[in-house]
């Protein structure tokens, strides 16, 4: 009593307290960062190593394996995967959430150093690492195009000037430059001319290497001067290499230009990048795992004018893709939804109380509670994201509930003729415990979420804390500001005011009377109600088992990502043509705004594409509908497949896959893995629950297998090293010398001119100079035949691995796909030597599925404990919790009706319903117990009176929560796919719960009261005050 009086009779202090809360909230709001979702990125580090021209199998055995054995000893590594392709190895380390990425980076560097002695000596550089996840979609893509500069020159500007500067910006984790390679002098040899002149490829390599030397020459001094010695020992352009003498034949000089075509070109000609059909260099920017995407993008944009000024005016630097506009648009939609929810719940109050003065009170209380929450969010290190703003949107219905309960009870006393200040004090005292019970039991729902680990726990933590803080501030406001405003603002109703909205008042009275009549009938047919209650429990179980499930709703971020997978024997020229064909098909789609893509490098039969869709208000289709439409057109392109997927804000794992979900096969028996992977992949491709099934196992690449006759080689005076050096010189784009420039270093690359390598007969033109100086054709001591070879070798941990990726067709859920895959594996009879498991997002979904039921049970148990403590009773909490089955049925039926799978967002809705629907029962039970204690009423009379007395606040609080969630259901635009499942779940649960709990709660109350009396040895008062 004294606590409430302290605030009611000191209005200035109470107002200033509320102002202080509001001001702190405004300051917090201004400093909160913006993000699409809470920070849930796993710490990921990528280790890269290269050995030019080495086969994938060589890279896997000699580079990947030693590194994996060393890196695998690092503490906190949750997953280690590697992929080795032609000349390169990439190892992805994913760490536990609580692992500091900077500390992990130091451990990675130490592990690389420890493995250095086990790596091949011919590696051009030590392995490097980067704190970025290569499987993440870029947060921004910049393109460089020019009508005057070559692709190599554009790449040089991008990698030498732009990429290092961008990498220094806070939040940037990796800048990947694609579309070409660094400038180089390329030497294209003519095998026949070399043979005619008696010059070996090693002779050419040695001559070029010796002619381009950068060594210190020293200085000369006399008594007064010092001269630095400088020579023309370096050759920098193709024109300078052309006249280089590489051999003398019969007294005549053989110059490089006589046996080769020397050009200013690029290090690797098998690279191509495009933007909207125009050749381009791409800078793909990825953020650090812990970085904020909006802040990082804004920082990059702020530096763009400076970056533009560092490159020639003839180079056009453009933003081809930017993730931030759709994120901002989504947050704007949520903010609008929040404002609409606040307006609707205030309208509910106005309709029920029919008083402008009374409506002002929640109109003040709700904003104070919500705005004050921003201060706590800032102190907790949270961000303004879709989930935290959805929490505030839902909180509008909760925070107004507290104000409604207090306000309605005070208004009831005023209508009975009590003076305002007395009514405020008496009304608040009567419902203070009720408000406290409702708030604490609602916060208790989220305690299990705060203890939940892994990605789901990280994802839901901000939602739970934000909502809990809003409820806590609302509790404070409803017991301080609300009664004070009631005491000083409200007056006894006058006849003129009571006539307002008479129609709605009559409807409410009629509803209350009809409810009273129906409740009497129900209380005389309690067995029937018991059957209904048991039926809802059984229906809950059946609906939960049968409803389709997924991890997270499929988002439409306005960005698509596509992986091209072509025939494994395809040439680079044909692959570049496929890229152009696919880009034309996509560019012609009316919903597409921009297309960029690249191919080449170590994976000759693959490429990547990034598609920016038009804004949501300029297209009628969702991203998935656009993918479905394009899939039909793309399937007509022979010899290659383009797998499209919508970029999501949540992507787990470091695998660069061509689809959203992965299923990984592991085996220590590599032949068994290569035998069973095609069988499993083909079986999965036939399943209707899966789409775009593909695999990273690339073991059918075309190979020319050379077999040396070692006896013949020994007789001819040729060793294996000389023969291998010949092949590397001829076909390996061998980097044989370095050109030093002020800003960068460039290479001299030697190989047989592509004009002479158009077919297998090129091997017949190769020869080796033996130890007697004679030219011995390769065909004299080697035979060759075509064979198959892997284009990539993949590991997970230390086991060989193949990952099958898949998307979901429209209308199918991840639970459908998971069950179908499990059935297929059983039907195939896969041996125990090949182990299959879900990976990435699909793995997290499996883990979440296993914990969902436990989480719900834990939430119910926590609420029971809190209510039991508050009521000092084992029984009354069960009465209150009996409201939950009907809410669960309503939520699951609503999801089925809207064809929405049960996701993590829907789980949040179920958790919220546990907190919402019990409020009705709390209000009934509180007043029934009060009537039994002080009114000397029987339990049936007490609960009947409590139901009628609390009918109006029950309707008000339920409609307030309903209208608070309704804008989420009806919202469209960016991010609506996240908001709608939450709204659908809450609205469905509230509607069904309201229809049933008004009748089931009184029946359960009476049932437990009779049960208590039957098993009690002596009568005991139900609740001690």
Curated annotation (Swiss-Prot):
Protein name (Swiss-Prot/TrEMBL): Multidrug resistance protein MdtC
NCBIfam families: PRK10614.1, RND_permease_2
The UniProt record lists the keyword Cell membrane: yes
Main location: membrane
Keyword annotations of the record: Cell inner membrane, Cell membrane, Membrane, Transmembrane, Transmembrane helix, Transport
Family to which the UniProt record says this protein belongs: Belongs to the resistance-nodulation-cell division (RND) (TC 2.A.6) family. MdtC subfamily.
Induction: The mdtABC operon is transcriptionally activated by BaeR.
Transmembrane helix as UniProt keyword: yes
Native species: Escherichia coli O7:K1 (strain IAI39 / ExPEC)
Assembly notes: Part of a tripartite efflux system composed of MdtA, MdtB and MdtC. MdtC forms a heteromultimer with MdtB.
InterPro entries: AcrB_DN_DC_subdom, Acrflvin-R, Multidrug-R_MdtC
Location of the protein in the cell: Cell inner membrane
Summary of the function given for this chain in its UniProt record: The MdtABC tripartite complex confers resistance against novobiocin and deoxycholate.
Coiled coil segments of this chain: none
Transmembrane segments: 3-23, 333-353, 360-380, 387-407, 431-451, 463-483, 528-548, 853-873, 875-895, 897-917, 953-973, 984-1004
Gene Ontology cellular component terms for the protein in this record: plasma membrane
GO molecular function, one term: xenobiotic transmembrane transporter activity
SUPFAM superfamilies: Multidrug efflux transporter AcrB pore domain, PN1, PN2, PC1 and PC2 subdomains (SSF82693), Multidrug efflux transporter AcrB TolC docking domain, DN and DC subdomains (SSF82714), Multidrug efflux transporter AcrB transmembrane domain (SSF82866)
Topological relation to the membrane, as annotated: Multi-pass membrane protein
């Amino acid at each position: 009593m004294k606590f409430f009086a302290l605030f009611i009779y000191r209005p200035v202090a109470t107002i200033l307290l509320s102002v202080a809360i509001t001001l702190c909230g405004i300051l917090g709001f201004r400093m909160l960062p913006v993000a699409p979702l809470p920070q849930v990125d796993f710490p990921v580090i990528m280790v890269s190593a290269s050995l030019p021209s080495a086969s994938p199998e060589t890279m896997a055995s000699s580079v990947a394996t030693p590194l994996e054995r060393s890196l695998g000893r690092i503490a906190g590594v949750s997953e280690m995967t590697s992929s080795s392709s032609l000349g390169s190895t990439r190892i992805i380390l994913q760490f536990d959430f609580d692992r500091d990425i900077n500390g992990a980076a130091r451990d990675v560097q130490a592990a690389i150093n420890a493995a250095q002695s086990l790596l091949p000596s011919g590696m051009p550089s030590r392995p490097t690492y980067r704190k970025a996840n290569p499987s993440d979609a870029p947060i921004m893509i910049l393109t460089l195009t020019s009508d005057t500069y070559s692709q190599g020159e554009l790449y040089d500007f991008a990698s030498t000037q732009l990429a290092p500067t961008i990498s220094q910006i806070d939040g940037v984790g990796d800048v990947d430059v694609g579309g070409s390679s660094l400038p180089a002098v390329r030497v294209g040899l003519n095998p026949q001319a070399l043979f005619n002149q008696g010059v070996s490829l090693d002779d050419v390599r040695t001559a070029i290497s010796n002619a381009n030397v950068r060594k210190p020459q020293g200085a000369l001094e006399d008594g007064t001067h010092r001269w630095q010695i400088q020579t023309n020992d370096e050759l920098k352009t193709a024109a300078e290499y052309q006249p280089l003498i590489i051999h003398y034949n019969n007294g005549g000089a053989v110059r490089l230009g006589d046996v080769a075509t020397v050009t200013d070109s690029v290090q690797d000609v098998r690279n191509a990048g495009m933007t909207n059909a125009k050749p381009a260099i791409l800078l793909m920017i990825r953020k650090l795992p812990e970085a904020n995407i909006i802040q990082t993008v804004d920082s990059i944009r702020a530096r763009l004018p400076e970056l533009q000024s560092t490159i020639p005016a003839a180079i056009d630097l453009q933003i081809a893709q930017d993730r931030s506009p759709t994120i901002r648009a989504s947050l704007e939609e949520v903010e609008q939804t929040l404002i609409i929810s606040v307006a609707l719940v205030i309208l509910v109050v106005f309709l029920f109380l029919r008083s402008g003065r009374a409506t002002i009170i929640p109109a003040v209380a709700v904003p104070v509670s919500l705005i004050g929450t921003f201060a706590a969010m800032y102190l907790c290190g949270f961000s303004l994201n879709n989930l935290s703003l959805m929490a505030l949107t839902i909180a509008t219905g909760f925070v107004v509930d507290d104000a409604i309960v207090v306000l309605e009870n005070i208004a009831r006393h005023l209508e009975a003729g009590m003076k305002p200040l007395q009514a405020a004090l008496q009304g608040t005292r009567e419902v203070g415990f009720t408000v406290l019970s409702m708030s604490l039991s609602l916060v208790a729902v989220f305690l299990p979420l705060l203890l939940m680990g892994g990605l789901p726990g990280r994802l839901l933590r901000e939602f739970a804390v934000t909502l809990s803080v809003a409820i806590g501030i609302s509790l404070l406001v409803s017991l301080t500001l609300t009664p004070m405003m009631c005491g000083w603002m409200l007056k006894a109703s006058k006849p003129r005011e009571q006539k307002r909205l008479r129609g709605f008042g009559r409807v409410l009275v009629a509803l209350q009377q009809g409810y009273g009549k129906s409740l009497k009938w129900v209380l005389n047919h309690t067995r029937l109600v018991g059957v209904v209650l048991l039926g809802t429990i059984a229906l809950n179980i059946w609906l939960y088992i049968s409803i389709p499930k997924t991890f997270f709703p499929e988002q439409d971020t306005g960005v698509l990502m596509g992986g091209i997978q072509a025939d494994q024997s395809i040439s680079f020229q044909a692959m570049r043509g496929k890229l152009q064909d696919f880009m034309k098909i996509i560019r012609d789609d009316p919903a597409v705004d921009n297309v960029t893509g690249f191919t080449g490098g170590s994976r000759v039969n693959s490429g990547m594409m990034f598609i920016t869709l038009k804004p949501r208000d300029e297209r009628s289709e969702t991203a998935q509908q656009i993918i479905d439409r394009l899939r039909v057109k793309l399937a007509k392109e022979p010899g290659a497949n383009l797998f499209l997927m919508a970029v999501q804000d949540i992507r787990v794992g470091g695998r660069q896959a061509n689809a959203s979900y992965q299923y990984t096969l592991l085996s220590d028996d590599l032949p068994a893995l290569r035998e069973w992977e095609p069988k499993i992949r083909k079986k999965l491709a036939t399943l209707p629950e899966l789409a775009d099934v593909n695999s990273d196992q690339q073991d059918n690449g075309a190979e020319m297998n050379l077999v040396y006759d070692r006896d013949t080689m020994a007789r001819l005076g040729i060793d294996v090293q000389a023969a291998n050096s010949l092949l590397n010189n001829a076909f390996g784009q061998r980097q044989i010398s370095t050109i030093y420039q002020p800003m960068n270093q460039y290479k001299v690359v030697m190989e047989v001119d592509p004009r002479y390598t158009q077919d297998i007969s090129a091997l017949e033109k190769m020869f080796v100079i033996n130890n007697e100086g004679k030219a011995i054709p390769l065909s004299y001591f080697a035979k060759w035949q075509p064979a198959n070879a892997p284009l990539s070798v993949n590991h997970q941990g230390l086991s060989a691995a193949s990952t099958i990726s898949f998307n979901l067709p429209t209308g199918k859920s991840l639970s459908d796909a998971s069950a179908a895959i499990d059935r297929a594996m059983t039907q195939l009879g896969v041996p125990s030597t090949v182990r299959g498991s879900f990976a990435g997002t699909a793995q997290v979904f499996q883990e979440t599925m296993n914990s969902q039921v436990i989480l719900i049970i834990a939430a119910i148990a926590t609420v029971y404990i809190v209510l039991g403590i508050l009521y000092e009773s084992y029984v009354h909490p069960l009465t209150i919790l009996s409201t939950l089955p009907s809410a669960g049925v309503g939520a699951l039926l609503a999801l089925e009706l809207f064809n929405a799978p049960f996701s993590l967002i829907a789980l949040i809705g179920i958790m919220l319903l546990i907190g919402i629907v019990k409020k009705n029962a709390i209000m009934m039970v509180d007043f029934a117990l009060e009537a039994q204690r002080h009114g000397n009423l029987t339990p049936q009379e007490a609960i009947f009176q409590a139901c009628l007395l609390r009918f109006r606040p029950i309707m008000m609080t339920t409609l307030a929560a309903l209208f608070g969630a309704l804008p989420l259901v009806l919202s469209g635009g960016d991010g609506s796919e996240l908001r709608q499942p939450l709204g659908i779940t809450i609205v469905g649960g509230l509607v069904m719960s309201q229809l049933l709990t008004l009748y089931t709660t009184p029946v359960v109350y009476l049932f437990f009261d009779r049960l208590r009396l039957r098993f009690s040895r002596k009568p005991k008062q139900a609740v001690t005050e």
